[in-house]
């Protein structure tokens, strides 16, 4: 099955989320599955936690909008989630929202390999991701950062 363009689906998800007081975080379409799976992550605009009822209300409104817009052909599964533990931070707002949270940064080392560092996220700017690593501040150049993922606090 051909992968439909994501831009119109993302635009519809964003508009639907905004109309309900949510922010659309991400849209992922797994068109290789049978049935295909559309996974949309939302968060509340006021920063409070998303609950099951929130996911259900967004699912109903977005599902109806998808059907009306005929953006997906064939059968599909619609899954609504919220960002949380284990999620990859990508957008600037993610780095602002999760400042002070424990993260794992996967980065390139000087020899071209990969290393992981776990610490507390202090922020991200145009040049670097800044972490507190056991009391020491470290700036990791963004060009070396492969992934920043939320983790659970170390014991």
From Swiss-Prot:
One Pfam family in the UniProt entry: RimP_N
GO BP term (any one): translation
Signal peptide: none
Gene3D superfamilies in alphabetical order: RimP-like superfamily, N-terminal (3.30.300.70)
Residue ranges the record marks as coiled coil: none
Annotated family: Belongs to the RimP family.
Function: Required for maturation of 30S ribosomal subunits.
Protein's name according to its UniProt entry: Ribosome maturation factor RimP
Native source species: Synechococcus sp. (strain RCC307)
Upper taxonomic lineage: Bacteria, Bacillati, Cyanobacteriota, Cyanophyceae, Synechococcales
Gene (name only): rimP
């Amino acid at each position: 099955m051909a992968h439909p363009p994501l831009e119109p689906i993302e635009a519809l998800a964003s508009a639907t989320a905004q109309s309900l007081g949510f922010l659309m975080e991400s849209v992922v379409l797994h068109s290789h599955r049978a049935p295909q799976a559309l996974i949309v992550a939302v968060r509340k605009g006021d920063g409070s936690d998303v609950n099951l009822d929130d996911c259900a209300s967004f699912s109903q409104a977005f599902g109806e909008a998808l059907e009306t817009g005929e953006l997906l052909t064939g059968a599909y599964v619609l899954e609504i989630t919220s960002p949380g533990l284990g999620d990859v931070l990508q957008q600037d707002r993610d780095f602002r929202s999760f400042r002070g949270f424990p993260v794992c940064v996967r980065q390139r080392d000087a020899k071209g390999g990969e290393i992981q560092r776990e610490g507390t996220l202090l922020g991200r700017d145009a040049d670097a991701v800044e972490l507190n690593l056991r009391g020491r501040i470290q700036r990791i150049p963004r060009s070396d950062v492969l992934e920043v993922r939320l983790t659970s606090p170390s014991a």
